[in-house]
Design a protein with these regions (language model features):
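Leucine-rich tandem repeat or coiled-coil scaffolds
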Residues: 2-266
C-alpha cells in the first residue's frame, strides 16, 4: 500500500447540521510503501483549524514534501523541524512551502533544523511572509554549519535590501555549497544588489541567481556586471534580471550576456 499524496481539506456541514467545533486536528503525515527503497512525494494542502502541537509528522519515505495554502503554528513548525532532524533514513531531500505564513521564529526553527543536519538539498519558501528578520534568522542558522543545501528560493517574501544583504553574507566566501539562489520579487534595490555583487566576487559555487522583478537600478546592475566581468561567481551561468524597470541599460546588459556567454551561460 502506498500514499503518494496526503491532502487535508475543510468540509462544509450539510444543511440542518450544526457546524462541527474543531478544537484540535491531529494529523499524521505518513507515506507508506511496500518497497523499503521507494520514495514518494508528500503533499499537504488547504488544511484549516490546526492548533499548537496538533501535527504529527512522519517523513520517512517522502523524498519531496510540499505544504501549500495553510497555517502552521510555531508548535507545528517545531514538530516539523524535529522530524527533519530526527529522520534517519529515506528522508526528504526537497521541502517546498508555498503561501504558508512563517514569522521570524518559524524561519529560525527551519534554519536550525537544516544546520543541525538533514538530508535536504532544496528549500523553497514562496509567499511565506518570511520578511527581513525571518531571512536573517534563517541564513544565520544556515551559516553556522556547512549544510547540504544546494538550492534556496525565497521568492515573493518581501525581504528587501536587508534580506538580500543577509543572503549575500551566506554566499560570501563559499560558506555554503549553494548552486542555485532565487530572490525574485522581493523589493531588492541597489543597496541589496551591491551586497550581492560583492559576495559574488569570491563565490565559486553558484550556478544561477534569480533577481527578477525587484527594484534594482543602474548602480546595482553595474556592480553585478562588474563582479561577473572580474571573474566573480566563477561557476555562474545565469543571472536573471528581467522585471527590474530601472536596470534596462542595454550596454550593461550586453556586457553581462557576453561575460556569461564566455562561461557557457546566459
Amino acid at each position: 500500500m502506498s500514499w503518494k499524496d496526503v491532502s487535508v481539506r475543510s468540509v462544509a456541514p450539510r444543511a440542518g447540521m450544526a457546524a462541527p467545533r474543531l478544537r484540535y486536528l491531529r494529523l499524521v503525515v505518513v507515506c507508506l510503501t511496500s518497497r523499503a527503497s521507494a520514495t514518494r512525494d508528500c503533499t499537504l494542502a488547504e488544511a484549516t483549524d490546526v492548533h499548537d502541537g496538533s501535527l504529527l509528522w512522519d517523513l520517512k519515505n517522502c523524498s519531496r514534501v510540499t505544504l501549500a495554502r495553510r497555517y502552521l503554528s510555531q508548535g507545528d513548525i517545531a514538530a516539523f523541524a524535529d522530524a527533519l532532524v530526527g529522520c534517519a533514513e529515506l528522508c526528504p531531500t526537497a521541502l517546498e512551502l508555498h503561501t504558508v505564513p512563517l514569522d521570524y521564529e518559524g524561519s529560525r526553527l527551519l534554519g536550525l533544523a537544516l544546520a543541525n543536519g538533514t538530508a535536504l538539498t532544496s528549500l523553497s519558501l514562496t509567499w511565506n511572509a518570511v520578511n527581513v528578520e525571518g531571512t536573517r534568522r534563517l541564513v544565520e542558522a544556515l551559516g553556522r554549519n556547512r549544510t547540504a543545501l544546494t538550492s534556496l528560493s525565497l521568492d515573493s517574501n518581501g525581504i528587501g535590501d536587508a534580506g538580500g544583504a543577509a543572503v549575500a553574507r551566506l554566499i560570501d566566501g563559499n560558506s555554503t555549497v549553494l548552486r542555485h539562489a532565487s530572490l525574485a520579487a522581493n523589493f531588492i534595490s541597489d543597496e541589496g544588489a551591491l551586497a550581492l555583487a560583492s559576495a559574488l566576487r569570491d563565490n565559486t559555487a553558484l550556478v544561477s541567481v534569480d533577481l527578477r522583478h525587484n527594484r534594482i537600478g543602474a548602480v546595482g546592475l553595474a556592480a553585478l556586471v562588474e563582479a561577473v566581468e572580474a571573474g566573480g561567481g566563477s561557476s555562474l551561468e545565469r543571472l536573471a534580471l528581467e522585471g527590474n524597470p530601472d536596470a534596462g541599460d542595454a550596454a550593461l546588459l550586453a556586457r553581462l550576456r557576453a561575460a556569461l556567454d564566455q562561461r557557457g551561460g546566459g
